[in-house]
Amino acid sequence: MVNVSIARRYARALLDVASEAGRTDAVAEQLTAFADVIAKNAELTDVLVNPAYTREQRLRVVESVMQAIPGGVEATLANTLRLLVDRNRLGYLADIARLFRDMADARAGRVRGHVTSAAPLPADALAQLQQTLQQLTQRNVLLETRVDPSLLGGVSAQVGSILYDGSIRTQLEEMRRELKQR
C-alpha cells in the first residue's frame, strides 16, 4: 500500500504539471513507452533498481532510454525521471505509469476496456460494441482487443471494474452449474 501511495504522489504531480502545459496525452504515451522499454529489459531494470549502481550510472541509463524514444520526451517527463533517479524511486516506475494513465483518463472522462472474443471482431462490430459500452458507462471508452479461442464464441468485455460476459463458455458453465443443482 505504501508503494502505491508513493507512486500516486509522483503520478499526480506529473499529471498536474503536464495538464498545465496541455501535454497530458503526449506525456502519457512517452511515460508508457519508457516504462515498457525498462520492463522488457531485465538488465536495464537491474541497473535502475539495484543499489550497487551509482546515481550517475542510473542517470546515464535513463538519459539513454529517453533519447531512444521516438521524438524524445517532454521536458516535464524528463525532469520527473531525473527526480526519480535522484530520490531512488525508479522501482515505482511501472506503478507511476499505470496510475498516471488512469488519472489522465479519469480527468478526460475516458475509461479503458478490454474486449475478448473467440475470433477477431470486424471493425463495424467493434465500433458498435464500443458505442454500446459508452452508452452503458456514460464515458468515452477506449477498447483493446484480444482473441481467446477458449471462449468458443461470443464476447467478453471488461470496462473499468465491470465485466460484461456474453461468451458461450460462460453460458455453458452457468448451464452446468444449474444442472448440477437439480
UniProtKB/Swiss-Prot annotation:
The keyword Ion transport applies. This is ATP synthase subunit delta. It comes from Myxococcus xanthus (strain DK1622). It comes from the Bacteria. Signal peptide: none annotated. The gene is atpH. GO terms for cellular component: plasma membrane; proton-transporting ATP synthase complex. F-type ATPases have 2 components, F(1) - the catalytic core - and F(0) - the membrane proton channel. F(1) has five subunits: alpha(3), beta(3), gamma(1), delta(1), epsilon(1). F(0) has three main subunits: a(1), b(2) and c(10-14). The alpha and beta chains form an alternating ring which encloses part of the gamma chain. F(1) is attached to F(0) by a central stalk formed by the gamma and epsilon chains, while a peripheral stalk is formed by the delta and b chains. Pfam families: OSCP. It is a peripheral membrane protein.
